[in-house]
């Protein structure tokens, strides 16, 4: 009998700083904690500007001043954008999106009214997936937005996007997600859809906290090749893939 798979992650794809308005740590504090936990990269993904208390659009334009490495940890520059409507529109313009390394698109009740309308919610996620700048669909297991899981995963596979396995959905956020996330993860494995694991840290101590997400992926023996965060090479390869997809160069900030 094959042994249980062990996952080790090198990147936290989903972290917030004080710029999000309801998070409590700085980029430096997050990087320090990432180094302490043995991560090689983190992505700063503060909320998009339509989130109450979120950063102004200028914040995202000025991410260029952040060094490539802090405390020995490589810093990727991103956003957790808000999906605003069922057309999948997100709250940053193309001129900003094309500069970012990682764009997570998520449904939040402050920006998209919760509804039992599965078709509406599904359409919003699929249309966000079709956006060439979007990389990851954030916390899709939120029970206040029921979706057609298979259709969303089919779209993610078709467009080469990732479905997030969000650790905070098992711990502090979005009650009820812990029942839906295993269904999504299992179906992703079955369909060969890539996933990205994020802590969704809103305080530095949670950066690199993946215990529940990893437990789920190990329990279902998710193939390592379907998990973005397992090697630096895989992350870099995807970022090159993305630059080709959106027509960007090696250094998108120039």
From Swiss-Prot:
Residues reported to bind Zn(2+) 3: 80, 108, 139
CDD domains: PHP_HisPPase_Ycdx_like (cd07437)
Signal peptide span: none
One GO cellular component term: cytosol
Binding site for Zn(2+) 2: 22, 47, 202
InterPro entries, A to Z: Phosphatase_YcdX_put, PHP_dom, PHP_phosphatase, Pol/His_phosphatase_N, Pol/histidinol_Pase-like
Transmembrane regions listed in the UniProt entry: none
Binding site for Zn(2+) 1: 14, 16, 80, 200
Record flagged with keyword Zinc: yes
Cofactor dependency: Zn(2+)
GO molecular function per UniProt: phosphatase activity; zinc ion binding
Keyword Hydrolase annotated: yes
Cofactor annotation comment: Binds 3 Zn(2+) ions per subunit.
Matching NCBIfam families: PRK09248.1 (NF006702)
Protein name: Probable phosphatase TTE1963
Organism per entry: Caldanaerobacter subterraneus subsp. tengcongensis (strain DSM 15242 / JCM 11007 / NBRC 100824 / MB4) (Thermoanaerobacter tengcongensis)
Organismal lineage: Bacteria, Bacillati, Bacillota, Clostridia, Thermoanaerobacterales
